[in-house]
């Protein structure tokens, strides 16, 4: 990390955290009354702009995934008098101090991981009955000796202390992923589960985890967790914690949630007291292990939730480092909405003779309960189109709408615009402080602020019931992100609506989008269909695609960011 010498040093490079350069960290010399904030341009961050269009360079940006900070700019935007050295390489260096584990399983204590006892009613079902049930519920399985699915909660054979909590929730029957996933996970085998967001997969691994914990020896002082759940975002990690807290209450199972963006103190105290379950994002967990605050020697049940999203976000090196700290005979459950080659490779490397359950086709497809409306517009029409849709949607005061933008800057700009126009909108993205993100999510969940603006980083971690509409102000980089975005609505058997503004800038994605719409039997705008003739073949997974950047640095002062603190305009619209 270098501060840039000479005539106008650059700001500190990006990379101290996920894709965020520091805001105005090293401001150059006395010219700097307006030096732009340093990086924080998301996944593919460029350096912050310099004073007067380039005098005195801005902070260095991240590389393609925002992990390696670029050098600070020099006088005259980088050439000139002594540009800064290379920026921090924090994320890629994470785990460099982890001790290599040499596992001699013959000297390690044995542990129980097979708990499934097939109910006589399930055992009596013929293969024909089982095949019919799987076909009705779009369940496909792969692998040898896969247990039959269960059709009721009682058939799953959970102990009474688990069943009490399940029945208290009032669920009518297991979801398809639970029907097949519970017997698989309870059998102690490594499992891959592919299912859409909102399919009930969290409970599919939570309940077997509770059974697993209760069969293990009690934690001794200094022991790390027995169950480790890795998740891509803070919001998803908190959601998982809520489920584990709810269903582990009667067993007095302790848990903690370990993620960045908040002070470490409370997390360190939880780990020191001892927790049976740790839900974590990869970066903060490695930090805790490297600093000796916890260890993974006791982990015998590992969950990788939303594995595809973690890889999309560039966490693969960190995941591999973490998995190297866990005994290889553990039970591993990997859950994903999609099954691309990168996820397949990870499963092949770290899961042992796994069995697999897929809900629906392995071809990426949208939830058919969601009505998809795609409008071809010009860039300057977007705000007007959005306002017109909002006026119609918010005629029903119970509606909730989640608006997606491509960058943090646009998210903040749109939020200010809507608030000044009288709409109760709030925004959430990676540059917001954790307490602000929590507050925004709560305002949205409770309906106090029924309009939330978000970037893709937040898209997977947001679990809010009864989102009636998703609005894509900016189209994402690829059709996978599109499907994940619109999957925020139409959950748990409900219907939903997704409205997307599509411009000529998105033309390369037209063919992929039309394929998604066609598969879901949606109406296709003729102008969109016309684009497919000229637009090329689409962008695939887009690992090195256009950065989500553009947002300003976090900036000091105040409890909440300026966009969320913008006053509502006089003509309240809701």
Curated annotation (Swiss-Prot):
Its EC number is 3.6.4.13. Pfam families: DEAD, Helicase_C. It is an enzyme of class 3 (hydrolase). One of its GO terms (molecular function) is ATP binding. A motif (DEAD box) lies at residues 305-308. Residues 385-532 form the Helicase C-terminal domain. SUPFAM superfamilies: P-loop containing nucleoside triphosphate hydrolases. Residues 546-559 have a biased composition (Gly residues). Associates with polysomes. This is ATP-dependent RNA helicase dbp2. It comes from Botryotinia fuckeliana (strain B05.10).
């Amino acid at each position: 990390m270098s501060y840039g010498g000479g005539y106008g040093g650059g700001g500190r490079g990006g990379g101290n955290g996920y894709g965020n350069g520091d805001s105005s960290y090293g401001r150059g010399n006395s010219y700097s009354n307006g030096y732009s904030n340093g990086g924080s341009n998301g996944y593919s961050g460029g350096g912050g702009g310099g004073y007067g269009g380039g005098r005195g360079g801005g902070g260095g940006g991240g590389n393609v995934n925002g992990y390696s900070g670029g050098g600070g700019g020099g006088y005259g935007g980088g050439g000139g008098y002594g540009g800064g050295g290379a920026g921090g390489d924090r994320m890629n260096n994470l785990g460099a101090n982890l001790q290599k584990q040499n596992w001699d399983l013959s000297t390690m204590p044995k542990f129980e991981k097979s708990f499934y006892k097939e109910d006589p009613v399930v055992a009596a079902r013929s293969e024909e009955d089982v095949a019919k049930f799987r076909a009705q519920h779009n369940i496909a399985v792969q692998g040898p000796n896969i247990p039959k699915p269960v059709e009721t909660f009682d058939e799953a054979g959970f102990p009474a202390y688990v069943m009490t909590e399940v029945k208290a929730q009032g669920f009518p029957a297991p979801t398809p992923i639970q029907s097949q996933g519970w017997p698989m996970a309870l059998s102690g085998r490594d499992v891959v589960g592919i299912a859409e967001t909102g399919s009930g997969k969290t409970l599919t691994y939570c309940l077997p985890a509770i059974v697993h914990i209760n069969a293990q020896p009690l934690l001794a002082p200094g022991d790390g967790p027995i169950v480790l759940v890795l998740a891509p975002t803070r919001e998803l990690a908190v959601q998982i914690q809520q489920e584990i807290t709810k269903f582990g209450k009667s067993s007095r199972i302790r848990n903690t949630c370990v993620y960045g963006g908040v002070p470490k103190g409370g997390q360190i105290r939880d780990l020191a007291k001892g927790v049976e379950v740790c839900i974590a994002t990869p970066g903060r967990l490695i930090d805790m292990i490297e600093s000796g605050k916890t260890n993974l020697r006791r982990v015998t049940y590992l969950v990788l939730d939303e594995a595809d999203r973690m890889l999309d976000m560039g966490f693969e090196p960190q995941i591999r480092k973490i998995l190297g700290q866990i005994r290889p005979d553990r039970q591993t459950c990997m859950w994903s909405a999609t099954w691309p080659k990168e996820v397949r490779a990870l499963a092949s490397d770290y899961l042992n003779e796994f069995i697999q359950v897929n809900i629906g086709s392995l071809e990426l497809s949208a939830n058919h309960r969601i009505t998809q409306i795609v409008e071809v517009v010009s860039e300057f029409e977007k705000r007007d189109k959005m306002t017109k849709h909002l006026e119609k949607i918010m005629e029903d005061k119970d509606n909730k709408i989640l608006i997606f933008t491509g960058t943090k800057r646009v998210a903040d700009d749109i939020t200010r615009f809507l608030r000044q126009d009288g709409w109760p909108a709030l925004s959430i993205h990676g540059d917001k402080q954790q307490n602000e993100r929590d507050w925004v999510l709560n305002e949205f969940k409770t309906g106090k602020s029924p309009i939330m603006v978000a970037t893709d980083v937040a898209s997977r971690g947001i679990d809010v019931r009864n989102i009636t509409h998703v609005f894509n102000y900016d189209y994402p980089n690829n059709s996978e992100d599109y499907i994940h975005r619109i999957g925020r609505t139409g959950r748990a058997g409900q219907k939903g609506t997704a409205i997307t503004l599509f411009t000529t800038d998105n033309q390369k994605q037209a063919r992929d989008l039309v394929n998604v719409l066609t598969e879901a039997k949606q109406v296709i705008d003729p102008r969109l269909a016309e684009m497919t003739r000229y637009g090329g073949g689409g962008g695939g997974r887009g690992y090195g695609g256009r950065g989500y950047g553009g947002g300003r640095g976090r900036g000091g002062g105040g409890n909440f960011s300026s966009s969320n603190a913008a006053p509502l305009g006089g003509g309240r619209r809701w």
